Each structure stands twice: as structure tokens, then as C-alpha cells.
């Protein structure tokens, strides 16, 4: 459950290390975002010399969340941290590598490039 003011780790090599959620996209009064949802965020911590700067407003897709997610088959999935991948306006990831596992829900939301770059899909 990612909401406004939630801080997330960035799971790619775009240069950002931590982001803070500004808005959850997908409806006027939408409060929470889960795996596969898009958020608008600001970069809170970045690597010096990277193409993403601190204070920059970016879009990101959630790839891991601490809150357990119930799947259609009745199983639950949860991760140790909240993490996101920065995306371009076209929906492609800004980085060229993804770190850590990602949720299978990304496949249903058509983020095939993120799925193919990820080392593990759970």
C-alpha cells in the first residue's frame, strides 16, 4: 500500500536511490498504489553525476511492496521493502538494469521490458 508521502527504494540503475510519492495515478480520489501501479514522485536521493537529479519529478511503477497482495489463486505475495522503477512517458524503464525480484502482476499490466530485465519474477 503505497500512498502520498511514501518513500520507496529505486530498483534500477537510473541514478536515483530513493523517491517520495507525490500522487497515485488512476482515478481522482485514488489513495493507494500496489504492484504494477504508476505513481508520480520526486527524487530524494541520487547518485552524483547521474542523469536523474535530486528534486526532479518523475513517474515510476511499483515493483515490490511490503503489504501482502492476494492473488487470484488464493496465495499471498509480499516483499521486504517498497521499491519502484522509474519510467519514461512512453512506459519504458529509464534504467538499463533492474535489481531484485519483481511481482508477477507486472506481466498482467504489460510491463514486458521490466519483466525481461528483472533477475527474478515472483
UniProtKB/Swiss-Prot annotation:
Signal peptide: none annotated. Coiled coil: none annotated. InterPro entries: Ribosomal_uL14 (IPR000218), Ribosomal_uL14_bac-type (IPR005745), Ribosomal_uL14_CS (IPR019972), Ribosomal_uL14_sf (IPR036853). Pfam families: Ribosomal_L14. One of its GO terms (biological process) is translation. SUPFAM superfamilies: Ribosomal protein L14. Part of the 50S ribosomal subunit. Forms a cluster with proteins L3 and L19. In the 70S ribosome, L14 and L19 interact and together make contacts with the 16S rRNA in bridges B5 and B8. Binds to 23S rRNA. Forms part of two intersubunit bridges in the 70S ribosome. Belongs to the universal ribosomal protein uL14 family. This is Large ribosomal subunit protein uL14.
Amino acid at each position: 500500500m503505497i500512498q502520498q508521502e511514501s518513500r520507496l527504494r529505486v530498483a534500477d540503475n537510473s541514478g536515483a536511490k530513493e523517491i517520495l510519492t507525490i500522487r497515485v495515478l488512476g482515478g481522482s480520489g485514488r489513495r493507494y498504489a500496489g504492484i504494477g501501479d504508476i505513481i508520480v514522485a520526486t527524487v530524494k536521493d541520487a547518485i552524483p553525476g547521474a542523469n536523474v537529479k535530486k528534486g526532479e519529478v518523475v513517474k515510476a511503477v511499483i515493483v515490490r511492496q511490503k503489504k501482502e497482495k492476494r492473488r487470484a489463486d488464493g496465495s499471498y505475495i509480499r516483499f521486504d521493502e517498497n521499491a519502484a522503477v522509474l519510467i519514461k512517458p512512453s512506459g519504458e524503464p529509464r534504467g538499463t538494469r533492474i535489481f531484485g525480484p519483481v511481482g508477477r502482476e507486472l506481466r498482467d499490466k504489460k510491463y514486458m521490458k521490466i519483466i525481461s530485465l528483472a533477475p527474478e519474477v515472483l
